[in-house]
A protein has these predicted regions:
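N-terminal signal peptide c-region/cleavage motif recognized by signal peptidases
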Residues: 14-18
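N-terminal non-catalytic regions of secreted/periplasmic and cell-surface proteins
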Residues: 20-58
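Generic anion/oxyanion-binding catalytic loop in active/binding sites
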Residues: 10, 31, 89
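Intrinsically disordered, low-complexity boundary segments flanking structured domains
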Residues: 10-12, 46, 76, 107
Length: 123
């Protein structure tokens, strides 16, 4: 009976630790809702170390002044930052004036994918 209790407690502690390991987006550059010039690199900073082989992002132009179009994927390189909690998205060319959305997927040691997005505008 004692072994069962110890095993149950150990499993409970392990599960609570894993549940806390979901990465959360802490900040981004440009920040959510920012208006500015075309960024050379977009930085996403997370609460947990990322598993780069399962994490990624897409950069999408969602609106261009004076033009109606569907969301348009933009060519960009996605890489890990120097910090394992950072993801870098580097557009392959300067972004034209418009609205953008970074659709990200982050996976940490718990292996559960977490998704989200960051929107910003280029003037």
């Amino acid at each position: 009976m004692r072994t069962i209790k110890i095993t149950a407690i150990t499993l409970g502690l392990l599960m609570s630790t894993l549940a806390q390991a979901h990465p959360k987006l802490l900040s981004s550059t440009p920040a959510e809702g920012a208006d500015g010039t075309s960024p050379n690199t977009i930085e996403l900073h997370f609460s947990e170390n990322l598993m780069t082989q399962f994490s990624g992002a897409k950069l999408v132009m969602t609106e261009m002044p004076g033009m109606a179009h569907s969301p348009m994927p933009m060519k960009a390189k996605v890489a890990a930052g120097s910090d394992p909690k950072t993801m870098l998205i580097t557009p392959l060319s300067p972004l034209p004036t418009g609205s953008y959305n970074v659709e990200w997927r982050a996976v940490s040691s718990d292996t559960h994918p977490i998704t989200g997005n960051v929107s910003f505008k280029v003037k």
